[in-house]
């Protein structure tokens, strides 16, 4: 199921006045921080502090028992003053669980693809949104791929991403998410056939994102499609323990 939550003006703030945009990807661990408290306000505060225009969220609850059956996508939309598109990947504790995108830009259309599964486990998906960015279409993709030690499922997920983007050829694409694999892995090598890892071109340092209190691995990424008229100006990892991951933020220029 897909849901659209609207709060405030879609074109408010920085997004309406500049040809640059800020993108964030953030696995929010259903809003639970390293202190084991669920606090959506601090997630929204971080988004606002980083002045993000588009945010890819993973591990988002809607009507789930562990988060008191709250409509977390709608709450995050209201707290951030943005539009939220939520995609359910599987039913959990009486509610829905999946990915979501917050955006200041108008949403033209969206769809969600459930990945094929080779083994029983958590259903994963690819949320695909076409945004109107200053009169130009931008394809924004949000995913959370398989986490298990054997990369068979992740490689299949990467193949499905390559298949899913075929209708968007010729348009700039930004792919965000938790890939549960490190740079140089077979998963990332597959994704890199179609996309450029923006940390490799505009990041400083190692870009480690998990665990949040003392990160040891980089598994969260912002990618841009090769040849896209989008330039990564800088990419960084803010310090935060509002989730078990740290977010990744990138500033981009539309050429």
Each model region followed by its residue ranges:
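Bacterial N-terminal signal peptides
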Residues: 1-7
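A short beta-strand-loop structural module common to alpha/beta enzyme folds
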Residues: 56-61
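Active-site regions of metal-assisted phosphoester/phosphodiester hydrolases
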Residues: 10-54, 66, 78, 83-86, ...
């Amino acid at each position: 199921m897909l849901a659209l939550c609207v709060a405030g003006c879609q074109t408010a703030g920085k997004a309406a006045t500049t040809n640059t945009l800020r993108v964030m990807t953030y696995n929010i661990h259903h809003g639970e921080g390293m202190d084991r408290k669920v606090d959506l306000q601090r997630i929204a505060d971080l988004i606002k502090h980083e002045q993000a225009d588009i945010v890819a969220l993973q591990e988002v609850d809607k009507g789930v028992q562990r988060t008191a059956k709250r409509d977390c996508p709608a709450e995050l939309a209201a707290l951030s003053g943005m539009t939220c598109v939520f995609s359910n990947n599987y039913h959990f504790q009486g509610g829905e669980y999946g990915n979501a995108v917050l955006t200041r830009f108008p949403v033209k259309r969206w769809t969600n693809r459930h990945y094929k599964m080779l083994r029983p486990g958590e259903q994963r998906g690819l949320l695909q949104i076409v945004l109107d960015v200053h009169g130009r279409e931008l394809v924004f993709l949000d995913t959370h791929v398989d986490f298990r030690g054997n990369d068979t499922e992740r490689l299949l997920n990467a193949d499905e991403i390559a298949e899913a983007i075929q209708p968007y050829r010729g348009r700039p694409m930004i792919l965000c998410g938790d890939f549960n694999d490190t740079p140089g892995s077979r998963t990332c090598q597959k994704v890199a056939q179609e996309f450029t890892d923006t940390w490799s071109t505009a990041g400083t340092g190692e870009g480690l994102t998990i665990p949040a209190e003392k990160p040891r691995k980089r598994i969260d990424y912002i990618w841009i499609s090769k040849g896209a008229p989008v330039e990564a100006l800088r990419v960084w990892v803010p310090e935060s323990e509002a989730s078990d991951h740290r977010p990744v933020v990138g500033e981009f220029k539309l050429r």
